Amino acid sequence: MHIVHSIAELREKLAPFQRPAFVPTMGNLHDGHIALVKQAKPLGDVTVSSIFVNRLQFAPHEDFDSYPRTLDADAQRLEAAGCNVLFAPREKELYPEPQTYKIHPATDLGDILEGHFRPGFFIGVSTVVLKLFSCVYAGKPSGVAAFGKKDYQQVLVVRRMVQQFALPIEILAGETQRAADGLALSSRNSYLSPNERIEAAQLSKALKALGDAARATPTPDLLALEAQAMQALARRGWKPDYLTVRRRADLQPPQGPLASEPLVVLGAAKLGNTRLIDNLEI
């Protein structure tokens, strides 16, 4: 596996290939990232991953400075998974000057849920993803990029951006990888204390219970069910931002009977100092 730190080096390594399969990450890799690499690899003629902790998607009070940087261990895992090129740029390489041109997702998708509780988050995500796509796919007739469904809203934001800009990139949404107790794998799980790690599995259980309740009748009172789910988590010591049932296609609240509507239950809540997100399609 080649490890490159500059855009010029990256493009040189990718020059012989026509269809990169790309997995962008912020590092501190877990089995979910590795599963994405393995899923994407057969869909391209070269497999690329990136590790870059993107300052633009962190608010001033968030964990940019403390986010784990584990490049050597990550590189070993990527190589073992069959990655051919790892792009690990320094901040000055991707942002040699202040990034004044930014991608602002449409408010109906970018300003709800995660976008509401983390203002500017999807602006930072969309901007860095488009920039990474430019680095990886420049001059290529097609490509594939893999993202995990754990970040469900992010997948929709990126997919819509690709459609809006007519980019020749297929977006692969990989299934969420989970621990044996149901906790969605996340780089931020490493922040949890031993007791918090045990409790953290309750988030996926709360989402499943909410989903089951929503599907129990054709016309449920979703607002009441969502409020009850949040109260139940709060009683366990969590600080929930949202637990909600939405349409899969656009993350808007469902209208009318739910029987035929493809839905997803999404949640975000803070346990101690760690904010966790998860979702379940129902």
Swiss-Prot record:
Signal peptide: none annotated. It is an enzyme of class 6 (ligase). The active site is at 33 (proton donor). ATP binds at residues 26-33, 148-151, 185-188. One of its GO terms (cellular component) is cytosol. Catalyzes the condensation of pantoate with beta-alanine in an ATP-dependent reaction via a pantoyl-adenylate intermediate. The reaction proceeds by a bi uni uni bi ping pong mechanism. This is Pantothenate synthetase. It comes from Polaromonas sp. (strain JS666 / ATCC BAA-500).
